[in-house]
Amino acid sequence: KFDDNCYELTVLRWFRDNFVSKEDIEHYYEVAPIIVEAINKEEQSDIIYDYIYDNIVDYCVEQIEQGNYDKAYSRYKNSVLILEEQFAKPVLINRFVKTLKLKTNN
């Protein structure tokens, strides 16, 4: 777990505020809590978070430090979409099915 003011988060926030589109930021804030919720339910969540740190956070910070903003943005955006497909989509489908069941039972 990160300290809220750690170096990596500070760099990533600067990058977000200066380079990430408003639409991508809004999308991230919609899906990120669902992704985290789903990962936290996984038996090997620590391994998943280590992977995210090593392959997304650390990579993006390194690219930002080197001024490779396009590479950082590409990795960030693709990673969010992959994590959404892997973790958020099943949660959202499950919620939708439960809603439909409630409506048909009433």
Regions found by a protein language model. Give the residues of each.
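Long, compositionally biased charged/polar accessory segments in the mid-to-C-terminal portions
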Residues: 1-106
